Amino acid sequence: MQQEDLAYERKLRPIWESIEIGNYKKALQDVEKMLKKKPTLQCARALKAWAYQRLGRTEDSAPLIAALEEEQPIEATTLHALTLYYKETQRLDKICTLFSNAVRQVPGSEELLSQLFIAYMRIDDFKALQSVALQLYKLRPRNSYYFWAVMSVVLQALRGPDAHNAQKAQLLLVLAQRMVDKFIAENKLEGAQEAQLYLQILQEQHKYSEAYDFLQGALCQKLYPGAPVYLRIDLLKQLNKWGELNRLLKELLLQEQDRWDYYQDYINSTFELIRAGEKPDGADYTVEMCHEFLCDIIEAQPKKFRGPYLARLELNRRMVEQRYAAEQLFGKMSDMLAEYFELFADKPCCALDMKLFLEFVKPAHERRTLATKLMNGLGLSSATLPASKEQMQRHICTLQIARYSGAHAIVSEELLHAIYTSLSLHYEHGYNAYGQGLLVTDMGPSDAYALLAAQIMYERAYRMQRSEPAIEALCLLNHLLGNSVNNFHGKLLALQLYHRLGLTQAAQSAYETLDIKHIQLDSLGYLHCAQLANAGFPALAKATYEQTLYFFLNDIDANSEFPKALYNFGTFSKLVEIVDFRSRLANSYHFMLVTVETLLLMVVSSGGTLSQLLAAYRQTRRKPAEDRIRWDKLHDNRDLTIFVSWDPPSDEEEQEEKKDKPMDNGTGGEKEAPVVAAVTKPVGATLEERRERLQKRSYEQDYDLLRLRTGLSKMLFSLVELHLSRTSVECSAAQQLRDDWVTVAADIRSKQHAPISGRYLVNLLPSRLHLYLSLPYERVFTQLADFVLDLWKGYSIEQLTLAADKCSGDVTAIHETMKRAIETYHQSADLLWHWKMTHELVNGCIEMISLMVFLLAVCYDKYLHAPTSQAQPSAGKKVKKGPENSAPNTATTTNASNDASSVVPERERLVLVTKVLRELKQTINAMDLLLASWKPPLVEDSLSAAIERMSLNPKCASTVQSTIAENALTEVRDLRKLLKDKLKLMSKAI
């Protein structure tokens, strides 16, 4: 028997290989041959189902899988094949059932139990993990299995269903501690990871004293001799042992004199000692002692480190924030920053360091005075160029500080242009003098000039509401990227600027040069994908969305295997992080939005017949009534730190920050402050809070955008399902989703969201929510839904005629909206500056028309093939059930007493659908004429001449010029083709 199994396994191997390399038809041929010889061979049937699944033939694979599930296989290769099948179909819970049945039949199998453990791990069933781990431990008493169980209990407490119940979570943590205590008492603890897990359990229970004693004890020193010092630091902070912490950090700083994190904790411990009034031996418990220690490090250091100098600034900053008197400070903040500048301005990080402390130079005009002082100290003027690379870096630093201090915000547009010209020339000089012979991966030392100049020029364009300065900025960025091909800052600014101008095709090219991959598709994808849905290039948007979705769907599978490796190696400390990471990725806002937009885009961009579109829809459709978005767990994974911003905070931001400032604590002119505030913001907290406020405000708008688009998608596809399945259940669901759409749209409109300012280039781009609120989406799709629901019910010919007239009126209104947008654009003095707003409105109108065509084409197709009788018996039953099961419809005035005799014949409903489709045809033809008359924006020749006078590469100007023209012409061509495709879609009806 064993020899027979081996023979079959050898014959199955080529089938495995065929599936793995994508030769599914060959695999099916081979497996059919095997099944003719042995029809009951389970592994062959599993492989056959898997091959069918890979070919998209789900209806053929489902019966095979169902039969195998009934048989409950236990053979290893069959289980493996079924596991792969379930993974690909996103049915991970079925793997648990599969191995659970196998374990029941072979109770003593360590291999099957291990596979069952991994299966539960994939779906985060921590309670089942605990049970299986204990079974493994009973079968084979090994520490690894026991601590799998312990970790499973910890995960139940921290991330399980009872994690939000403090009492249950505490009981679970106590259980986990007792399980480890038992091993400690029996002297069974063996490894560092086990000791680390015990420390984690104690910390989660806030038993910091026990954790500290264990960390310092002989057992931990033996098992975990390499315990990182931050564990001790964190525990001392939690225990408020500030004196001991202060002494420890002093020792560490004498060994590592450039550790900025140690300096921050050291200074914080000093202020905590002052607040508590403690004076422990060997600790620094006054600001004078702290300052003296820092000065000693500065004097003793063998070479110049930034750490102790930053620590002096931080000490002074804390004293300013605690309202110490001016004479108590160790210097004026502006003077200390000037000193820091003299020491480290030749390093690119200097301006970023100083930015953390500039807010404490008050009042605001003092910051500009400081910037002027730094600039004057360089000995450079507008007519002189830096004599060395170091002097150039100092000059760049002063320019960045000047911009952040608001120096550019108070000057005229003409002076901004002069600054831009000067920076462009400085960039060119720096590139020629110091940027030659660098590696391809290196950024040029003078690149910062060009980056700053581009941002300044965009600000000028925004002030003037003209595109010429923005085009000059684009030319400079293109010139920069020609010299420094891997300067991602330049690529990001170019991408942002293209989107600001509505140049989608050029933005796509910039996005591709960034080479964003893997997790960056989630954290940085918003920079581009958020703008694509109504950007005029549906095919391009579809390809980008599919690439993004491929990452999410495949990476979720890959990430489900990470905990397996962590359990195998006993790396328990990272398990909670991995669970959180998987949750953030699976519930990513970006993932959900792209999923919804892809479904809508599939309809809008479709270029085939209705049958082809419905075939594509059936492959991707989900039940519209099922909401697969876990709204309470949605996570905003955007990385807003990707842009290095030197723009000054707005007046609104500064006013908001003033509200949070602490009141004077009354230190007056005393030598030492008797009272120190318990909470002091860490350095850079204001910048972080400013970013968080912006992210929160932006996310609120984007969250509502997702609600709006999800509501539209679900309502639209429920109406499609209604006419495909034609059941009263679908009617009730569609009616409910229509009412939900109305409620959501009204709620979002009532919030009156204001767009995010576009004054600065690196600001977040406005949410597309404002586009949809400016167009009649709410009215158009509500009335369309009412019409389609009334069509299905067929109560009254008068009511149906009225609903059809409303839809026809909406079609006309959409055309008028598009016509006004293009006419306003043509009347504007600067076509390119108004291109973005116009092309978004045009694309929004075309999307509305496309969605209407799809839904009404489905209705037409169903009524066209309806029986010729006046009313179907089944239809009469549906009509009686409909009003009882559906929510009230404002457009419905009849009641459940209508019987089959009052139902409008389906042929008459077909006439009304045809009427609206004909109106759509006329409108589409009129819209096509509008698109044909839509003038592309052109770059003036005088601008090209100005670019050449600045000694930039003339190719940059011609490249930008052709990019703008090509973008507009291609967009118009694609949109006209899309409209022709819509005519083809409804060709039967008209």
Swiss-Prot record:
Its main location: other. Signal peptide: none annotated. TPR repeats lie at residues 76-109. Residues 656-672 have a biased composition (Basic and acidic residues). It is found in: Lysosome. The keyword Transferase does not apply. The keyword Hydrolase does not apply. Keywords: Antimicrobial, Coiled coil, Immunity, Innate immunity, Lysosome, TPR repeat. SUPFAM superfamilies: TPR-like. One of its GO terms (cellular component) is cytoplasm. Residues 885-902 have a biased composition (Low complexity). Residues 964-986 form a coiled coil. PROSITE patterns: TPR_REGION. It holds the Pfam family NatB_MDM20. One of its GO terms (biological process) is immune response. GO terms for molecular function: acetyltransferase activator activity. It comes from the Eukaryota. Residues 645-672, 871-902 are annotated as: Disordered. Belongs to the MDM20/NAA25 family. Component of the N-terminal acetyltransferase B (NatB) complex. Non-catalytic subunit of the NatB complex which catalyzes acetylation of the N-terminal methionine residues of proteins beginning with Met-Asp or Met-Glu. Has 2 roles in the larval immune response: required both for the phagocytic degradation of internalized bacteria and for the induction of Defensin in the fat body. Within the phagocytic blood cells, has a role in detection of infection and activation of the humoral immune response. This is Phagocyte signaling-impaired protein. It comes from Anopheles gambiae. The gene is psidin.
